[in-house]
A protein has these predicted regions:
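Edge strands and adjacent loops of beta-rich recognition modules
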Residues: 174-177
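N-terminal acidic, proline/glycine-rich, low-complexity intrinsically disordered segments
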Residues: 2-6, 28-39
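Compositionally biased, proline/threonine/alanine/serine-rich low-complexity intrinsically disordered stretches
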Residues: 34-56, 257-291
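Gly/Pro-enriched, hydrophobic low-complexity segments
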Residues: 56, 80, 115, 130-131, ...
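Acidic/charged, solvent-exposed loop-and-adjacent secondary-structure segments enriched in E/D, K/R, S/T
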Residues: 131-169
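Bacterial N-terminal signal peptides
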Residues: 19-30
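Bacterial N-terminal signal peptides that target proteins for export
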Residues: 2-21
Length: 291
């Protein structure tokens, strides 16, 4: 979950936005309630000598959690995401989503999401990606690459579909974070978060400061909080994890939906129009002949 994206927090280097947008042009997540966030700020390079700020114990905790997640051939969990969004009064408002996640490595994923706004469903079976909005009975379908990691990338680039907790689902959660890691230190233990004893670690990577709580015994993430360091408002992003099940048998048919298959089709495409700089140039006008 620390994946080089650290719970999705570190994807700022790819200018990812927090709201989950569906190809149908409707918000699938908290943004549907008006919590649309600005793109994360540009990332920074690690300062010279940053390696001296990397505490071995903190790295050991992150690596152990990554190894536990990567070794699971199947898993399910619940993720509650809370995103702060500026209000007209000044103090931020909070919008939340609750996602029930099931995956089977290397090529199966299901995310059923409730939100402060319309619910959404996402299915991936190794060949096809399906984004379904039950309230509108609209579905977007697209061919998909053969791995969960590649499918998550494709869903984002093609349709702005993004899960803030995607980093617990990738094949190697620790790999990316290590590339831009600027500092990491061990805070101590907590017996308050997640109903168990957790190790608390703070780290900074790719312009994001993260505090994470990881089960001391089972090595599973329980909560993470992040702030983009160049965000002038220092808005907080939080993910709480619960109901972890690793290695359980996944029911046949879990990665498809008959209701979605029967819904009205819409293009699997980015919901926002391309900015002027990315829009194709208008055709040159043809001078009319003088009569």
């Amino acid at each position: 979950m620390m994946a080089g994206r650290a719970l999705g927090f570190l994807h700022s280097r790819k200018s990812r936005r927090w709201p989950l947008l569906i190809a149908l042009g409707v918000l699938l997540g908290a943004a549907n309630a008006g919590a649309q966030q600005a793109p994360p700020p540009a990332t920074e390079k690690a300062a010279p000598g940053a390696a001296s700020a990397l505490e071995p114990k903190a790295l050991d905790v992150l690596k152990a959690s990554s190894a536990r997640l990567a070794a699971a051939r199947s898993m399910s969990f619940t993720a509650v995401v809370s995103l702060e969004s500026p209000s007209r009064l000044g103090p931020p408002l909070v919008y939340s989503t609750r996602s029930a996640v099931t995956l089977q490595r290397p090529d199966k994923l299901r995310v059923i999401q409730e939100a402060d706004g319309p619910a959404s469903e996402f299915y991936y079976d190794g060949k096809t990606m399906v984004a379904f909005s039950p309230a509108e009975n609209l579905v977007a379908v697209a061919a998909a690459p053969p791995t969960i990691d590649a499918a998550l990338e494709a869903a984002y680039h093609q349709a702005a579909i993004y899960f803030p907790f995607s980093d617990v689902m990738v094949a190697d959660p620790y790999a990316d974070i290590a590339k831009g890691l600027e500092l990491a230190f061990y805070i101590g233990q907590s017996r308050v978060v997640g109903g168990t004893t957790t190790d608390m670690v703070a780290y900074a990577s790719h312009g994001v400061f993260v505090q994470i709580w990881i089960g001391a015994e089972d090595k599973l993430p329980r909560m993470a909080r992040a702030v983009f360091r160049k965000d002038p408002l220092l808005l907080r992003h939080q993910v709480e994890f619960s109901s972890w099940k690793l290695g359980a048998t996944v029911p046949v048919g879990a990665f498809a939906s008959a209701r979605a298959a029967a819904a009205k089709r819409m293009p699997f495409a980015h919901p926002d129009p391309a900015p002027p700089s990315e829009a194709p140039p208008a055709p040159a006008a043809t001078p009319s002949k003088t009569q």
